[in-house]
Amino acid sequence: MTAICAPPRGCEPDDVIELRSGGARCSLWWGATPSHAGRRTGFIGAIEAEDDDALPAVLSRATDRLRAQGCALAVGPVDGDTWHRYRLVTSSDGTPPFALEPYTDAVASAPWLRAGFAPLETYASYRDDALAARDPRVPALEARLRGAGVTLRVLDLERFDAELEQIHALALRGFRDAPLYAPIGFEAFAALYRPLAPLLDPRLCPVAERDGRIAGVLFALRDPHAPETVVLKTVVRDTDRRLAGLGFVLTDRARAAAHALGATRAISALQHDGSVARSLAADAVVFRRYAVLAKELQ
């Protein structure tokens, strides 16, 4: 269960705060964290507590430490960077956790709110139970992209590391404008995705190429605990404006493949509210919301 539902922890922290009372501890990062709206951030993550009542106290200690380091904004939970585990669930309709979801109880945000934190960035996961439907706009989009030199294929698991090298470079370009983004080295990136290889079905992972390199990719997998569900985990495309609509096409390909394989539900996971992809199916509905929280320090 852990291997498919718990994303790995992040990089080594700059400090660790620990309270003996309540068994609470957290890790802090500030040395290489990205700014947010021009303000220097410090991250709080890897939080553990035997008693939830101890969390406000350890968060208070953490914010004092980040303030002393010159941070203007304490942000959490973030385990080092947004390539690793981050976010809290803030609301849910009761749908069970899905594969690779950073799931928490919806009440987990309460200690943060009591400590003076508020939502900084918000996200949602969407449920799509109409996989048989194909958007009529897709053929025209595919034709335009073919005219721009784009070809489509499936992920090559026989050359997975070679695929990951190109996907890493693509992700650095495609995600660079995402909130709280910081670049990550190839080995750290590959360490996140290599363990997924046994779970991936290439038919669910469309890849777009142009000029001999990967220009877009979608990672999706069958949920081992709900085989009728396919989780659309990550979609990224090159930022070239001529590739507008490619994310939509990749998502449509994955949905069609899921339907052909007998799946009845697709989950578009952890979409940022400020940039929800237009590739979301028209019938998709929100079933879970998440947030990264922050507290002003200066």
Place the predicted regions along the sequence by residue.
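A short helix-loop-beta-strand connector motif used in the catalytic cores of GNAT acetyltransferases and
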Residues: R9-S21, H36, R194-P206, V285-A291
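Short regulatory alpha-helical segment in sensory/regulatory domains of signaling proteins that mediates
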Residues: L66, L172, A197-P198
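Active-site/acyl-donor-binding loops of N-acyltransferases
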Residues: W83-A133, L196, R203-P206, R210, ...
